[in-house]
Amino acid sequence: MLNIEKVKITTLSENSVADIDYIAEWGLSIHISIEGHQPILFDTGYRHACIYNARVAGIRLSEIDKIVLSHGHADHTGGLRSVLEVIKYENPNRKHIDIICHPAAIESQHVKHTDHYFYRGCPYYIDELTRLGARFKISSEPTWITEDILSSGEVPMKTDFESVAPICYLKKGNQYVNSTVEDDQALFILTNKGLIIILGCAHRGIINTVLYAREITKIEDVYMVIG
């Protein structure tokens, strides 16, 4: 387990800021730095805030080892292209960066308002991102990022008081199919003080996610839940 003092978590994009030097936007991006390991980026925000804020904070995105996507909605994947471009610019010799996500994260995701469907998935073609060095590692199962960091994969729906908003849909062919946001996942960091659980939107429920974290890590103590 990691010593908690070796873990540094920096929010690079969120819908509010605590300092006028930074900018806010819809969505989320979190930089995770652990002593002795290359950093990890959890989500990329909606547009460019994570890039701007990383520069203000003195964080070099080219040092990121992997990008983990909490799910496919645009406010978490919209910064992908810009992040990959910055990595390529800062380190032209780098060939690939792994992007870890659920299979549904790259499907055609929509939301329904009144009688209309609006696209809310990743705003880029997968081929477009792979040309910039993205190497997709796609799985619905838990995936070890390091020996102490685990992506949850698909979170089981166990509680009877948490549910997915009925406005989420996947477009399959010409049909819109109701989605339970199966791609929603979290990061679990195993530390000497307990689990740090990093959420995206937690579409499948915060409590469901915490219960699953305890189940697959066999650690009962939860030190922190953020996201």
Describe the function of each predicted region.
Residues 22-23, 35-66, 81-82, 88-90, ...:
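Pre-active-site segment of Zn-dependent metallo-hydrolases
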Residues 60, 136-145:
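Short acidic low-complexity segments
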Residues 6-57, 180-199:
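Conserved beta-strand hairpin/beta-sheet module of binuclear metal-dependent hydrolase folds
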Residues 49, 74-77, 106-108, 143-144, ...:
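Active-site environment of divalent metal-dependent phosphoester hydrolases
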Residues 66, 73-79, 97-98, 177-186, ...:
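Cap/insert and terminal regions of metallo-dependent hydrolase folds
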Residues 65-140, 153-164:
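Active-site HxH/HxHxD metal-binding segment of metal-dependent hydrolases
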Residues 113-119, 141-192:
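Active-site-proximal loop/helix segment associated with metal-binding centers of metalloenzymes
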Residues 14-15, 44-47, 72, 103-105, ...:
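Active-site metal-binding loops of divalent metal-dependent hydrolases
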